[in-house]
Amino acid sequence: MKRIYLFSLWLLGCLIAPMQGQAVSQAELLNSERFEHIDSSADSGRGDGKYLDLSSVKSVTAPNGHRRIEASIYVSMPAANMIQGLSVQYDYQMDRSLRHLINAHDNSLKQGDKTPYISIWRAKQENSGITGTVNDDGTYYNNGQIRQQRVYAENLKAMILPAEFGDEKYKLPNLMYKKAYGIAYDDEP
């Protein structure tokens, strides 16, 4: 019985220790060297909103014709005394970048096709070329302490997905892409 108890304590320590390393406070989110605030029309200007952890942005292996990026973001809700940590991964289809679609359209115009330019906009709205996945990374109080409350998966996804062209949720994956590769996704040929 004593062994089970000690094993349980050890296991609990292994599970909580990694979560404490990811915890952030409201004050830390305001450090512009580590976090970048993602402007949103929903922000009140009182420290709420989404923050990208610049140190977490990294490219990961992707199939041919794609690029993938992982990062951590934090959604701050000061009035609720809550910060929601999220681990996100975006997949970018290189043949769906705006520059690629414009180049393909220009080539078809040179070959006599009379498709109007608005078709590029419509094609991009149908499929932005960016798909994302979101995982809950933990919930924290504004002071950085771990909070046991969890946000529902539907709410997590609604905060940043889907990345539709022309929509506010399109900013985050584009910011991540620019941080990882030094060029905007839609400027890729």
Give the residues covered by each predicted segment.
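Classical Sec-dependent N-terminal signal peptides that target proteins to the secretory pathway
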Residues: 1-23
